[in-house]
Curated annotation (Swiss-Prot):
One of its GO terms (cellular component) is chloroplast thylakoid membrane. It catalyses: a plastoquinone + NADH + (n+1) H(+)(in) = a plastoquinol + NAD(+) + n H(+)(out); a plastoquinone + NADPH + (n+1) H(+)(in) = a plastoquinol + NADP(+) + n H(+)(out). It comes from Cycas taitungensis (Prince sago). This is NAD(P)H-quinone oxidoreductase chain 4, chloroplastic. The chain crosses the membrane at residues 4-24, 31-51, 87-107, 111-131, 134-154, 167-187, 207-227, 242-262, 274-294, 305-325, 330-350, 358-378, 386-406, 416-436, 462-482. Belongs to the complex I subunit 4 family.
Amino acid sequence: MSDLPWLTIIVILPISAGSSIPLFPHRGNNIIRWYTLGICLLEFLLMTYTFRYHFHFDDPLIQLEEDYDWIDLIDLHWRLGIDGLSIGPISLTSFVTTLATLAAWPVTRNPRLFYFLMLAMYSGQVGLFASRDILLFFLMWELELIPVYLLISMWGGKRRLYSATKFILYTAGGSIFISMGASSMGLYGFDGPTLDFEILANKYYPVVLEIVFYLGFFIAHAIKLPILPLHTWLPDTHGEAHYSTCMLLAGIPLKMGGYGLIRINMELLPHAHSLFSPWLVIVGAVQIIYAALTSLSQRNLKRRIAYSSVSHMGFVIVGIGSMADTSLNGAILQMISHGLIGAALFFLAGTSYDGIRTLFLDGIGGMAIPMSKISTMFSSFSMASLALPGMSGFVAESMVLLGIITSRKYSLTFQIVIAAIMAIGMILTPIHLLSMLRRMFYGYKFLNVLNPYLKDSGPREIFISICLFLPVIGTGTYPDLVLSLWDKKVEAIMFRSFHE
């Protein structure tokens, strides 16, 4: 069984299974829901089996490689493979998508298209993290965009068309830079065109050309992550999307930007990355404070959480730019941690809306008593988001901070200034999160209003919240459980960055 194309099966299963959804009867909403959930569970089990029995975690090299000719005219190969850097995002994608499918249970309008788009998005995301061909990477990047656009524009709020259009303009604009960079890198050189990541990683470019390549890919990944000032699509998108779509957006697409920065900008273009890394650190540190302050001024609950996400991504940017093993490990852990915590917060914001029919904090108050379960879960994940010790966010942010302080690349003055800015950001995060909790769950406004929609969490909501909370606690108490997945790969990347 080890000879089976496991990665190909994992990549194509969701979209191929989703293609059969239109064959289901029009009134078979429950059948469609259970079928989609079953496909997600099957995918998760296949992924778990493959990683458990066919992947060696102490090997930093690419494993489970598959290479098939696809389009000879442009030398495009179906080339897949994974290493420690891929395994975390793929596992996160599978886990969050399965729970988002369960979270989407109340969706009744055109569920066949809704669940097909979720499965198509699933394939695109897993395919991107498993790609070993830069053009295939671009195609998977594009495959993920259209489902997200349709999910926002068809199942969003009142301003869904504006938000969906803004999302597609930003991300499609970034895709242009990826396509240009991928084709240019593939065609450069005297030994013939190649799109293989492994070969591209060993190519050497003139300094100016490498900087041009780096900036092109950086713009695309900066939009996705997002990085200031290319972040404005994110609050609008989260503010209008259905909460199951928000779970997917918070859990995975943002991580595609961080993954791309490491996989392409850092691994394929190390010299340019070394030149730009101080600017990454500065921008990341500023982003932590700016987004935290902006979050504090938001009246809409989902927009406040969205800006909090932008602030947390600042730690990822600092970690990638720090040029230190500890910080890069922390940045990857922060992506995984935020994928879980962010998905949970948006899910709970959505379930709160189902009960109170408003997202504006000015009209919310006193929810702690009538909605005690939601209050408990929301408070728990908010503590995780503000990096409470014992939870995954604390470990990730502490590693990034420690890494920048001990980095060999920067002067002591630079390290102290950046560490001080990050520390201020870590103080601002509890301020805007605790302020949000105070306004939502305490006070008197809501208690004096008779609301026929008022309801607390049911078994489904509690189950999803517990499933997301357990890995947050597990990673916070025993971080080596996940750090061991990619620490060897991080060592290899940093060794190459300092010795080439």
